[in-house]
Each structure stands twice: as structure tokens, then as C-alpha cells.
Amino acid sequence: MSTASNRVSTQIVDEHKQFNNELPKFMQSVGLLDAGFNYHVVAVLGSQSTGKSTLLNNLFGTSFSVMDASKRQQTTKGIWLSKANNSPILVMDVEGTDGRERGEDQDFERKSALFSISTSEVIIVNMWENQVGLYQGSNMALLKTVLEVNLQLFHNKKERCLLQFVIRDFLGNTSMENLADTIMTDLNNIWASLSKPEGFENSVINDFFDVGFTGLPHKILCSDAFSEAVDSLRERFVDNNNSDYIFNVSYHKKIPADGFSLYTREIWDTIENNKDLDLPTQQQLLAQYRCDEIITEVMEPFSTACTILQKEFLPGNLCKDLPTKLLNMFETVIEAYDRQASRYNVHIYQKKKQELIASVDSHLYVFFQAQLNALHKELIKSFFDASNEFPSDTPFKESSSIKINELVNKMREEGESLSLPHVHWDVDPFILKLSEELTQNSETLCKEKLKEKLEELFTGFEFEVSEAVEVAFQKLSHNVWDTLLNEFLAAQNTTIEKIKNIVPFYVDIDDTKTTEEYIINFKKNSWLFFRKKIDSEMSEVLLQQRLRVYFEELFRYDSDGMPKLWKKSGTIDRDYRESLTKTLDLINVLASIKVSDGNYPDLNVDIKTLEPEYTSPASFFTILNRRRVSDISVNFKRSADLIFMDCKRSVINTTTRIPPYFWVLLIVLGWNEFMAILRNPFVFMILMFGGTVVYGLYISGLIWPAKMVLERATNNLVDLATDRFSNTYQEQVQQRAMQRTEKSGSPVASADDAEAEKTALS
């Protein structure tokens, strides 16, 4: 660096042919790293000490080292690079030829010329006017190298380059046209002497080069004229509106500024290692390398954005504004890539762009998938919630189908909103999965809803039938089955009609087969429930109780429900026989469920589909088999006999009369006692209260139970008093025995006395 503080110039190749790897920093410092194609490269060639650096400093405002006038020695060593002042032009100052420092070593001269023409758009050939026409002095040997190199590198692409000859110390004695003709003659002679590739044997120099000529007066002797000529030439370099603007579009090497450092390094390494220089291949390699670098650069902030976005995704939740976020992330990374990589080889740029899109696709697809999976769960939940609010007057299937289409469209809309340019994310698998699950859930819900409705109907049916059975068995009669069957069949038919109306709401309207299946199942279940309820109401204990109630109502009460009062034993015997016969007949009626004509009811279902134990209607409708009928009849008759004996005893007690003379004697002999009782209010009140209680018990028929309770209570009191007395007496006997023992000293006798007393007490 000639000026390290602002990096105005840098040596890219030193005198030892080593390339400077700090060139990217230089490009950054001069503000050209992001210039893209908006920059130009100019190189100067010429003999040593001919004022090349001075020309560049005056022309472009650079600060290359210049020769000390008092010392005729080499100042520019290697290849230096600087940026033109206020213009995006990279100026390359190349070590001069014919220097005594290198002598006969022409290797660097050839390599620097090859490097210059490979990287520059314009080659400034600096020469003195008095050197024109001379082979060595006019740099014809160097120009031959330039022409050979250009033909070698660009014959396939026919890229053009400008050779801008600057004639120094131009006096004007010989016109510029004549000087130009002389130089062109020499160039044509050199071109004709070159060995040309096949197909270019007849080519001329103007097929590959544009040649320009400019004369500059003496810098010291004609300083003002020199400055004016330099200013005029500078305008041609910096003003693109100038009619003689030097930088033609065809001159540009199409190397983006951010790849210039890498490109020049690879070019120099190839030249230095004496390899065949294939610039198109080098440009492709550069494009591939730079595109990879750019992808790495743009993927760093993209990966960071992905990490941030991932934190916004709570498990199973939707991410708000995800389509906008994904699109912004996608466009940001692609635009950043396009902004830098689009300047390179189009084929490589497009190929790498597709790789970048694929990488971005794989990263963003995770969010696409997570969003649709979260939406899937949300839509499934919303379907279940909505199913509870479906209109009651619309078939569930129809409402379900409408809702499924609505939710599937939401999934499709969300998937399409997440789509990105040049990226195809297939939402169909997510739609198919959602549709299948919703359809499956719909069918499940249909079955559950229908099951709930049918269970609700069956529960109402069970309640109605249970109530009818319980009421019927509370008051048994010989036509109990007719009554029960009428109520059962009425409830069954009503429920069947409801089933016919409900089932089409949850299955296809035309699916009559399913409706029939539900009706048949209901009939089976209804008959089984009816039979089960009958069995529970006709258990051994309940049946005995109800038969006893039925018997007592016939035996104890008349047709008006009033208790019977028997005065003759013959009457009670007749009533007993009639009541017993009717009750035993009722047992036979209850044994089988039959209608009044003696036939079994019509099941309207296949008996074999009910339960394995039922093989025929007779087996289903038979509640009590012959053995159970016999057992129940025997047990009941025993109970009936007890009731009869109790009633018979009460009749006998009632009919046994006290002699009339007894009442006369009672009045005569007990007159004084009667009067004493009547005169004593306390005793009279006790007698009145006792008489009222006894009369009430008699009227209600509870006199006998009350008598039994009183006798039992009296016996308990007597037993309790006896135990207390016995215990007290035993204690006294033991005490007396102990006292006797102390006096007589004979415990055996005392024990015998105690035992004797105890025996006597018992």
C-alpha cells in the first residue's frame, strides 16, 4: 500500500510474482465490493521509465509511486491496483518492460501482459512519439505478446478489447493520423505473422481489437496543454454521455466486483503455474465458487430467521401471519442471492439458484407442514364442536357433509396461502388426510348420536314398560297379561315410529335396510327387557307376597273393600275355599304369558336371534315351569292355611258367650266398687283412656297383635325381675356361707348349704 490509511492503492502481484490475498479488503475499502458490473478495469503497459505511473496519477487521480527524475531506476515493481478518483474504475499499473533489473528475463513481461489482457477492458499502451516506428522502442515485442495472448484466450468468444495508444510528448510535427497509420501497419504485420487457430486464418486485428490513439504534449514544457489533453482524455473515461466514451459494453469481462478478487487470484495462479489459461472455464469456476459463497452468506440470516420463527410455534398451535412471514423470508433470501449472484455465469447462477430454492424449500416446508398439522387438529376440534349445534330439522349426514366441505376448503385455502414462488408444496395429502378423518369422525358421530337417541328412546320405553309391569303386579288379576301386553305393544309401536323418524337423520335417506335393522334390534331388545322385567317382578319372595295380598283381599275383604265379619264358621270355610281356588288359578295364569284366547303373543322377530335358551315362543313366554308352579302352590297354601286358622280362631273366640247370670252377679257384688271408681276422677279417667285404646285396637283389628306384644313385654319384665332377684339372693347366700365358714371352719358344709339353697331357689 502506498497510502495505508485509506488504502488508495495496493500491490496485487509483487516483484516475486506472489499474489496479494488482501485484495478483498482493498475492494471493500474503496467501496466497489458491491458494485456488481458497475465498474471498469484499465491496465497500462509500456517501457520502463516512460511515465506510466505519472500518466495514471494525472488521468485518474491515483497515487502510484513515480520515478525520481534524478534517478533513472525502476519504481513500479510487480502489478499495482488503485481506484480512480470519483469514478468506479480500477486502474492497474503494470511493471514496465525492457527494465535492466530483469534483463533478458521476459517471463514476468509475458505473464503480466497475459494477466492484464485477461482482466482489463482497456489496455493503455504508453509510448514516446520518437519511439513510433521502432520495433523495440515502440513496444512492438510487447504488443506481439498481447496479440498472441488475446488470440489464444478469446478466439472462441471473440471478446473485444481496446488498445488505447497514448503518444507522449506529442509535438504535432507529424500528424496523429500518420503516427496512427505507422502503428497500425506494425500491428497488422505482427498479426499476419501470428499462428492463428483453425478457422481464423483470414482474420484481421480489428476482429478482436479496437485501437485508439491519443497524443499528449510534454508534461513539463507544455504543462497547460498537457493538463488540457489529460482532462479531455479523462472525460472519455468517466463521462458515459461523451460521444468518444471509451468503455464499450463489449469490453466488460462480466466479472462482478465481489468476485474480482477471486477471479484475478485464480487467473494469476493459472498463469504462474504455466497452465493453459481457459478464461471461460475460469469464469465458470468463479461463478460456481462465488455462488456457493453467496448461498452460504444469505443462508446465515435465513437460518437465524428460521430459528426465531420456530420459537413462535407452540406445540399444536397455529402461527399467526405465517404466510406473510414465510414469503418475506423466502423473498429476502432469494433477492439477496439474486442481487449478488445474477452477475455471474447465467447457467451457473440459475443452477445454484435452484439449489438454494431447494434448500430454502426444505427449511420452510417444516413450517408449512407444522402449520397444516396444527390446522388439522383445530379443524377436527371445530367439527366436533359444530356437530353439537347442527340444526335439528336437517339430517345429520347433510349438515356433516356441508361442514366437512367447509373445513376442507379452509385447509386448501391455508395451504395455497402458504405457497411460495417457484416452490410447489402439495397440499393434497393434507386435504386427503383431513377429509378421511373428518368423514370417519362424521360416521362415528352419526353412530354415537344415533345411539344416544336410540338409548334415550329405549330408556323412555323401559320406564313406561317398567311402570306398567309394576302397577299390574301390584294388583294382580286373571287378565293381567292382556293388560300388560296391550300397554307393552302400544309403547313398542310408538317407539318404532319414533325410530323410523330418527334413523334417516343419521343415515342415508334411501338406506331403508339400516332402518329396518335398528327396528328389528329394538324389537329384540324390547321383548328381552319385557321378559327380564317380568322375571324380576315374579321372583319367589315377591310372588309369594303378592299372592298372599291377592288371597287376603279375596278372603278378608268383600267386593266393596270392607273387612268381613264372620259370625258362623261355615261362612269362613266357604270364603276360604273360594279364595284359595282363585289364587291357585292365578298361579297357573301367571305361569305363561298368554292372551285371553290362550295363545302366545306374536313376537314379530326370529326367536332364535333372542337368546340361546329360547328355542320356541313357548320357552320364551313360559315364566314358571311345572315344578315351580307346584312349589309356589304348596308354599302359598301353607301361608293361606295360617291365615285361615287365625281367622277361624278369632271367630270361635267371638262366638263363645258368657252366661247372662254372670253379669247380674257382677253388678250386685261389684256395685260398691263401681261407684268408688265413678266417684274417683283420676281412676275414672284412666279407665276411660284404657277403654278407648282397647276399642280402637278392636276396631282396627289390632287387638290380637297388641295382646301378643303385651304378653311378650310382661314375660320380659318377669324374666328380668327374676334374674335380678336370683343374683341378689345368690350373693346373700355366699356371704352367709362365708360367715359360717369363719365360725365353724367347715367349708364343705357351707358349700353344701349354699348349693341346697340355690337348688331350692330354682
UniProtKB/Swiss-Prot annotation:
Chief site of localization: endoplasmic reticulum
A GO BP annotation: endoplasmic reticulum organization
Record's keyword annotation contains Cell cycle: no
Membrane topology: Multi-pass membrane protein
Domain GB1/RHD3-type G: 36-251
EC number(s) given by UniProt: 3.6.5.-
Gene3D superfamilies linked: P-loop containing nucleotide triphosphate hydrolases
Region of interest (Disordered), ranges: 736-762
Binding site for GTP: G46, S47, Q48, S49, T50, G51, K52, S53
Family statement: Belongs to the TRAFAC class dynamin-like GTPase superfamily. GB1/RHD3 GTPase family. RHD3 subfamily.
Function, in words: Cooperates with the reticulon proteins and tubule-shaping DP1 family proteins to generate and maintain the structure of the tubular endoplasmic reticulum network. Has GTPase activity, which is required for its function in ER organization.
UniProt-recorded name of the protein: Protein sey1
Protein's organism: Schizosaccharomyces pombe (strain 972 / ATCC 24843) (Fission yeast)
Lineage: Eukaryota, Fungi, Dikarya, Ascomycota, Taphrinomycotina
Encoding gene, per UniProt annotation: sey1
